[in-house]
Amino acid sequence: LRSLLGGGFRESGQEEYSKIEMPSIPRKFARVHLTHDIDCPYEYHGVRSLFRAYVKEHKSLWNAYQLAFRSLLSDRYFTFDRFLEWNREVERRLPKGKCKTLFFYKTPSKEPEDRPNYRVTHGAARRVHLYARKYGVEEAFHIPMEGSLHPERIEHQLHLLEHDLKKSITHARYHYLAAREP
């Protein structure tokens, strides 16, 4: 910041920049937030995944069936138990209260960018929610693309997630800033 201000003052012909005192900022983190977006909690799960694997990915019917209806723990996208163990190790190494884990859930939407659609109370997302409760993870709102295109729907989506989680939400994340003005 000092070099930026100094350069600006030098360009304007003023040499007053040396009188500006910048406070020294200690180089340490106040808090560490370990965040995970629950965008796609599974690779294959259910009937739609069966058809996707068979039709779009040209897998054999038997292979597609096995992928779609296997245990979630053997799905390569369902890695939350491992992540939470790693997070726990990080939390142990930091002072108490300086580190927390957050899961950001989406709400169902009609936009293709928001797929797959899921509710926290059903299927694989419910399993993620149970892990969050078991490990003391704070759950938060991941604003979907539909919220960018129709900001008036964000409040409804937030209430839907709060209803599903049965608690109020205090954190939100938004990835689609390029789509609309923040």
Where are these predicted regions, by residue range?
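Generic structural signal for well-ordered alpha-helices
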Residues: R2, F80-R88, A125-L130, I154-H159
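Acidic, His- and aromatic-enriched active-site or binding-groove loops in soluble protein domains
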Residues: Y54-H58, V120-H142, D164-S168
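Short alpha-helix boundary/capping motifs
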Residues: Y77, H122, Y176-A178
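Residues at alpha-helix termini
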Residues: E89, R93, K134, L160-D164
